[in-house]
């Protein structure tokens, strides 16, 4: 058995330090060393606005704030705090869903669609107080991953937030002349998101529609939003509803990818189609109001402060969507 025994070295008590002594040594503070380390960190971060500086009074003496150059500033709010808003930069927030409670007028036959378009044209002609009548425009068609996009199946329009028109084209070989005349009416300003692509598709599917005249006079809401609000990027209708109208849209994939060519449309499809043009009309009105406010604020500022001050403020990122209360040089 002795050969399997391992002889362990005997610890010497001479080199053993008691645990009490060790703990005392570790607890001794070293204020001088800490101060040197902190001062070294502060020197490395000199001229930087950092919360790690321990002595604020000494830091302010060593690093006085840089003197700002003389320029036009605004006392009411910062002009470019978060940069240019864009669809990619928008922070998702919980917004109430759009609820449309207006009328939905749905037609599938050529004669019914023509009569309805005539009715809308008469309403447009009666708007004598304005030279332009905005009309939200959108389209729907079936889509298959095997065969791609189908023929244009639905046109929906909205000229008044209380009523939306849904025209299903599935049974039509040609679009009624009255509907073509309506969308080409000189007072009508068609608007939507990516609306130019819709007109090109409509012209391919129905040659009696000329795309270019419609493209020349239409308004893309995303482009207009970037011009007025000085935002950037490409907008979807859903993101515009979030940003401009502060509303959420229920863009159900099941409804969006449904069979739009099948007659009749169900209630979910009709509501989906109506909400698209209804919220488009709401967004148009809101951007229009912001544009008018912006032009008014710009004119008042130029009159009070001059063209040079206006250019200086614009260079700082001011949009003039709200009124400037005070300006200092």
Curated annotation (Swiss-Prot):
Its primary localisation, in coarse terms, equals nucleus
Listed EC numbers:
3.1.11.-
Give the superkingdom in one word. Answer: Eukaryota
Q: Which residues form the 3'-5' exonuclease domain?
A: 130-288
Compartment list = Nucleus
UniProt keywords, alphabetically: Exonuclease, Hydrolase, Magnesium, Metal-binding, Nuclease, Nucleus, Phosphoprotein
MF (Gene Ontology)? 3'-5' exonuclease activity; metal ion binding; nucleic acid binding
Q: Which residues carry this modification: Phosphoserine?
A: 78, 86
Question: Which GO CC annotations does the UniProt entry carry?
Answer: nucleus
Q: Which residues does the annotation say bind Mg(2+) 2?
A: 138
Q: Name one GO biological process term.
A: nucleobase-containing compound metabolic process
Task: Give the compositionally biased regions (Basic and acidic residues).
Answer: 46-65
Q: Which SUPFAM superfamilies match?
A: Ribonuclease H-like (SSF53098)
UniProt xrefs under Gene3D superfamilies: Ribonuclease H-like superfamily/Ribonuclease H
Give residues annotated as binding Mg(2+) 1.
Answer: 138, 140, 276
For region Disordered, the annotated ranges are 26-88
Enzyme class label: hydrolase
Role of this protein:
Has exonuclease activity on both single-stranded and duplex templates bearing overhangs, but not blunt ended duplex DNA, and cleaves in a 3'-5' direction. Essential for the formation of DNA replication focal centers. Has an important role in maintaining genome stability.
What does the similarity note say? Belongs to the WRNexo family.
Indicate what this protein is called per its UniProt record. 3'-5' exonuclease
Organism source for this protein? Drosophila mojavensis (Fruit fly)
Species lineage: Eukaryota, Metazoa, Ecdysozoa, Arthropoda, Hexapoda
The encoding gene: WRNexo
